[in-house]
UniProtKB/Swiss-Prot annotation:
Changing A126V: In t1666; causes recessive maternal effect lethal (Mel) phenotype where homozygotes are viable but offspring display an embryonic lethal phenotype. Its EC number is 2.1.2.1. GO terms for molecular function: glycine hydroxymethyltransferase activity; pyridoxal phosphate binding. This is Serine hydroxymethyltransferase. Its cofactor is pyridoxal 5'-phosphate. Belongs to the SHMT family. Interconversion of serine and glycine. Pfam families: SHMT (PF00464). GO terms for biological process: embryo development ending in birth or egg hatching; glycine biosynthetic process from serine; tetrahydrofolate interconversion; tetrahydrofolate metabolic process. Changing G172E: In t1665; causes recessive maternal effect lethal (Mel) phenotype where homozygotes are viable but offspring display an embryonic lethal phenotype. The keyword DNA damage does not apply.
């Protein structure tokens, strides 16, 4: 009895203490944040319905300045594009208000009737654009971007600490294909999966498929990745398929850069030979910033006795995306992707793709005319890699000077580069300017501007210091350099502003 009384008293004291603590916590939660400065919105306006120019002039000015930068400059980053006004309308629609964890017909929230309709429509269009049979292919349209899409695939088909093989980053691959250095595991894909990169032939710059096959038979990866971020030639998907089958691996194709050209039917498609295909939606596909994962359905293989082995990718990949890596999808992005996919089905989109390829070849020839070496000698797609090592200019220095002259590109490693931190070239792409209406004769002029910028970098290279930091400091203070760049920038702006940019007029 005494024990029970003590126990009750102890419990009473415990609850009393807990109650006291809760009251203290409650008081703390409601204590005003003394250091937060708040502003009062004007009485005659509505913060929820007014234009961003009124609600937040500071943000509006930044957006407006970015629009001006895009308009006055030459956008040559191969992974960028200008999406349409219709896609932007979808991104700014009421679809951004809804939470919808799960998949159509199986959501964790109510009120998803039209969200389901939009996601199913997006899936339908994604399959139509690439000519895929819904009985043989499925697609997940929820990945937030390309990197998590690739990670979801590895999670689904490779598993923790499983083995993957992708093209090495310095040779034209992507971070998400398993990149690491001797010093550290740079990408999470090399942290959670075992990665063995394959390489290009340092002489030709072309993928060494024989060496890839040899290493795949030794390494026995669960997935081989046929994908690039800076490789100007077509991939041999049939050869990839044979190697993957021989090694007992899935073939995953990452067509993020080239999916728009595949959609237009202008370059080889990975679908005939792949088990899984991923893509972003904002590069040559010209949509919003999102991603798609396509996966095989039906029969994977048949043994000598006629027994079929079926694909089981649908549930694995969908589960890896949600709930594995993501929560609620971005429904406004899915709406924007659906709009972009409808545009892919137009004749106008095919004409755009054809012009992208013509412009890339024109730019390649113009750069060669100016004496520059190109990795692989040219291009079959939307990009080219200019090797600046023969003229003694690092890619980062060329990128910096071109940026000052309103020409946006990116430094990039070239085959044979010793360090990814000091790349020897610059990558150039044609989709963005093609979307602005640039044609072959315009890209000849673009090539001339690039040449001028690189020559300015070369002219001042020796006196500008040994490090990139020294070089940038020099460009901020040296008056002859600043005069040369200002002259080029003025002519670039005069040329570029003749062309319109899709989207909203001012921001």
């Amino acid at each position: 009895m005494f024990a029970r009384i003590v126990s009750r008293r102890a419990a009473t004291g415990l609850f009393a203490g807990a109650s006291s603590q809760c009251k203290m916590a409650d008081r703390q939660v409601h204590t005003p944040l003394a250091k937060v400065q708040r502003h009062k919105y004007t009485n005659n306006e509505n913060i929820l319905v007014d234009h961003v120019e009124k609600v937040d002039p500071e943000v509006f000015d930044i957006m407006k300045n970015e629009k001006k930068r895009q308009r006055r400059g030459l956008e040559l980053i191969a992974s960028e594009n200008f999406t349409s006004k219709a896609v932007m309308d979808a991104l700014g629609s009421a679809m951004c208000n809804k939470y919808s964890e799960g998949y159509p017909g199986a959501r964790y929230y109510g009120g998803n009737e039209f969200i389901d309709q939009m996601e199913l429509l997006c899936q339908k269009r994604a399959l139509e654009v690439f000519g895929l049979d819904p009985a043989k292919w499925g697609v997940n349209v929820q990945p937030l971007s390309g990197s998590p899409a690739n990670f979801a695939v590895y999670t689904a088909i490779v598993g923790s600490n499983g083995r993957i093989m992708g093209l090495d980053l310095p040779d034209g691959g992507h971070l998400t294909h398993g990149f690491f250095t001797p010093a550290r595991k740079v990408s999470a894909t090399s942290e959670f999966f075992q990665s063995l990169p394959y390489k290009v032939d340092p002489t030709t710059g072309l993928i060494d498929y024989d060496k890839l096959e040899q290493n795949a038979m030794l390494f026995r990866p669960k997935a081989i990745i046929a994908g690039v971020s800076c490789y100007a030639r077509h991939l041999d998907y049939e050869r990839f398929r044979k190697i993957a089958t021989k090694a007992g691996a899935y073939l995953m194709s990452d067509m993020a850069h080239i999916s728009g050209l595949v959609a237009a039917g202008l370059i080889p498609s990975p679908f005939e030979y792949s088990d899984v295909v991923t893509t972003t939606t904002h590069k040559s596909l010209r949509g919003p910033r999102g991603a798609l994962i396509f996966y095989r359905k039906g029969v994977r293989s048949t043994n000598a006795k006629g027994v079929d082995t079926l694909y089981d990718l649908e549930e694995k990949i969908n589960s890896a995306v949600f709930p594995g890596l993501q929560g609620g999808p971005h429904n406004h992005t899915i709406a924007g992707i659906a709009v972009a996919l409808r545009q892919c089905l137009s004749e106008d989109f095919v004409q755009y793709g054809e012009q992208v390829l013509k412009n890339a070849k024109t730019l390649a020839e113009r750069m060669k005319k100016h004496g520059y070496a190109l990795a692989t000698g040219g291009t079959d797609n939307h990009l080219l890699l200019v090797d600046l090592r023969p003229i003694g200019v690092e890619g980062a220095r060329a990128e910096h000077v071109l940026d000052l002259a309103h020409i946006a590109c990116n430094k990039n490693t070239c085959p044979g580069d010793v360090s990814a931190l000091r790349p020897g070239g610059i990558r150039l792409g044609t989709p963005a300017l093609t979307s602005r209406g640039f044609q072959e004769q315009d890209f000849e002029k673009v090539g001339d501007f690039i040449h001028e910028g690189v020559q300015i970098a070369k002219k001042y290279n020796a006196e500008a210091g040994k490090t990139l930091k020294d070089f940038k400091s020099f460009t901020e203070t040296n008056e002859p350099f600043k005069k040369d760049v200002a002259d080029l920038a003025k002519r670039v702006e005069e040329f570029s502003t003749k062309f319109e940019i899709p989207g909203n007029e001012t921001f």
